């Protein structure tokens, strides 16, 4: 990968001039000038997904200049580098190959001259065999009963992805009850343990090193709880499995290393649901559906790696995001799924984007003088409409939004879905076109009221519009289409990282807090007054000690 400061490129300078021409152009004007705008600014993927980006403050010239930026930053070369197993995560000297985990074509992918696909396939086969034994009831707990509940213990990528996917694909789930524990706050695991029976519960401990503080604290608490009922430590092996590479620590915990599912250092945590970390997904929806999830992602991988940039969905969404983030000064993006099963999707890509591209140092080691990753947030519709859409519609901040919805619902109750989708369509129309003062006044006249007598309230009912959105309409949320959607966002994030000249696949920003917490933890063991920190931290620790009793 080349290290190119995007702001020093000719394309960036051209975009800056173009922005001066575009900053006062409205979405309404763009639609008024071109009746064919939708067909020019939308792409259908695999007859499963329609991405409409027409309600953006862009023209064909805008996209052409953004494509020039991608070319000048050698995006095509970076894509090739990632897919070929080059060690593009240079700060950790690692390849980045989540695409290998879902490489259903099984073509060789080399890391250090070795094809990784045989090992990938071997772990998948092991996951298949194990999951089928659990789901069928062939696997018995220590009292001879079948497993009814699965508790995934992990944090970050070992929790967010599996939890998001198992929730999104609940219509495909089997009889097993899924639970997820991540927070080191004892409340999290305590509440889950109240719901399960030690005789019929399987715990998955997801930690590559088997040393992650939060995960191992929860795992040991689960083990202690289990042994209070089971007594003999030999029974641990029937109720615990590990998603890890540390065979020694796994064995010492009491887990049979035959039930340790490995992954590799070229799998980043926030891209790991496709790996053994996805075992909870397999247990929830079955192996065949998990393969469909992989297949959907693989289809998007092929689209991303082979489609010209002009019709390449991850590239288009990435470039539009850069347009708002780096030229309009938008600081956030909202992800708004109109599907209750997708209620963790925004949270998943909050990590996916902010941990990937929340960097202030470029690939040359220099502090950047431009914006990098945006703040990502969102909630399902229509809940968000009654919470924060007020600011999106009438606030002073530009918030570009992705609206996501399925055409077909898994729960066709009465006219619920039509009402949901009517809101989905209405919101992007309202954000784009708004409501003028003239329309507000005419509405008053139609009600037999004189707008002049209501002049004090009219300004508050005006919507400026010109708020940008993308609409992603899925035929239906299936394992395949969800896999494709996740991969779409993954590759969007990668594309932005390439152009912004940052390392997307490390996360050094999570380390300092952990180091300081490890230093503070021994200081909390006694009641001595602390004076080794700044006055604020000392004061907080000392008040905690006084109040805890």
Swiss-Prot record:
The modification N6-acetyllysine is found at residues 80, 228, 234. It catalyses: alpha-D-glucose 6-phosphate = beta-D-fructose 6-phosphate. GO terms for biological process: gluconeogenesis; glucose 6-phosphate metabolic process; glycolytic process. Its EC number is 5.3.1.9. Keywords: Acetylation, Cytoplasm, Gluconeogenesis, Glycolysis, Isomerase. The active site is at 355 (proton donor), 386, 514. CDD domains: SIS_PGI_1 (cd05015), SIS_PGI_2 (cd05016). It is found in: Cytoplasm. InterPro entries: G6P_Isomerase (IPR001672), G6P_Isomerase_C (IPR023096), Phosphoglucose_isomerase_CS (IPR018189), SIS_dom_sf (IPR046348), SIS_PGI_1 (IPR035476), SIS_PGI_2 (IPR035482). GO terms for molecular function: carbohydrate derivative binding; glucose-6-phosphate isomerase activity; monosaccharide binding. GO terms for cellular component: cytosol. Pathway: Carbohydrate biosynthesis; gluconeogenesis; Carbohydrate degradation; glycolysis; D-glyceraldehyde 3-phosphate and glycerone phosphate from D-glucose: step 2/4. Its main location: cytoplasm. PANTHER family: GLUCOSE-6-PHOSPHATE ISOMERASE. Belongs to the GPI family. Catalyzes the reversible isomerization of glucose-6-phosphate to fructose-6-phosphate. This is Glucose-6-phosphate isomerase. It comes from Escherichia coli (strain SMS-3-5 / SECEC).
């Amino acid at each position: 990968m080349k290290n190119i400061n995007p702001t020093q490129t000719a394309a960036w300078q051209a975009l800056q001039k173009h922005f001066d021409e575009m900053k006062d152009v409205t979405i309404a004007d763009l639609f008024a000038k071109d009746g064919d705008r939708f067909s020019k600014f939308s792409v259908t993927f695999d007859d499963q997904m329609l991405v409409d980006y027409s309600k953006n403050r862009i023209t064909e010239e805008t996209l052409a200049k953004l494509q020039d930026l991608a070319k000048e930053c050698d995006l095509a070369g970076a894509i090739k580098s990632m897919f070929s197993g080059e060690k593009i995560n240079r700060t950790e000297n690692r390849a980045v190959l989540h695409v290998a985990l879902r490489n259903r074509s099984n073509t060789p992918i080399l890391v250090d001259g070795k094809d990784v696909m045989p090992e990938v396939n071997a772990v998948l086969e092991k996951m298949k065999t194990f999951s089928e034994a659990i789901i069928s009831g062939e696997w018995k707990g220590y009292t001879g009963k079948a497993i009814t509940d699965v508790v995934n213990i992990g944090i970050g990528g070992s929790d967010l992805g599996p939890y998001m996917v198992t929730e999104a694909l609940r219509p495909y789930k089997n009889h097993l009850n899924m639970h997820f524990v991540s927070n080191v706050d004892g409340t999290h695991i305590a509440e889950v343990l109240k719901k399960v029976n030690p005789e019929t519960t399987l715990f998955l401990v997801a930690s590559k090193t088997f040393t992650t503080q939060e995960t191992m604290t929860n795992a040991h608490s689960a083990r202690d709880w289990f042994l209070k009922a089971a007594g003999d430590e030999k029974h641990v092996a029937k109720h615990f499995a590990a998603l890890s590479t540390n065979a020694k620590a796994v064995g010492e915990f009491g887990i049979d290393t035959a039930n340790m599912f490995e992954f590799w250092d070229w799998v980043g945590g926030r891209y790991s649901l496709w790996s053994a970390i996805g075992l909870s997904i397999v247990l929830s929806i079955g192996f065949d559906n998990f393969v469909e999830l992989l297949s959907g992602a693989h289809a998007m991988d092929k689209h991303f790696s082979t489609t010209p940039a002009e019709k390449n969905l991850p590239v288009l969404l990435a470039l539009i995001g850069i347009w708002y983030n780096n030229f309009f000064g938008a600081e956030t993006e909202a992800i708004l799924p109109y599907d209750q099963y997708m209620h963790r999707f925004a949270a998943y890509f909050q990590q996916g984007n902010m941990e990937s591209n929340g960097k202030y140092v470029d690939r040359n080691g220099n502090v950047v003088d431009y914006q990098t990753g945006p703040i990502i947030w969102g909630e399902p519709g229509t809940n968000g409409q009654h919470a924060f859409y007020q600011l999106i519609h009438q606030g002073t901040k530009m918030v570009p939004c992705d609206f996501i919805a399925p055409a077909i619902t898994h729960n066709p109750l009465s006219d619920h879905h039509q009402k949901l989708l009517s809101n989905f369509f209405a919101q992007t129309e309202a954000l784009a076109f708004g409501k003028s003062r003239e329309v507000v006044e005419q509405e008053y006249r139609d009600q037999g009221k004189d707008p002049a007598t209501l002049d004090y309230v009219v300004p508050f009912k005006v919507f400026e519009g010109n708020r940008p959105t993308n609409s992603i309409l899925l035929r239906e949320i299936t394992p395949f289409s969800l896999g494709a959607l996740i991969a779409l966002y993954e590759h969007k994030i990668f594309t932005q990282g390439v152009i912004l000249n940052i390392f997307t696949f490390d996360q050094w920003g999570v380390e300092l807090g952990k180091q300081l917490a490890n230093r503070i933890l021994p200081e909390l063991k006694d009641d001595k007054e602390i004076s080794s920190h700044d006055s604020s931290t000392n004061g907080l620790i000392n008040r905690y000690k006084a109040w805890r009793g």
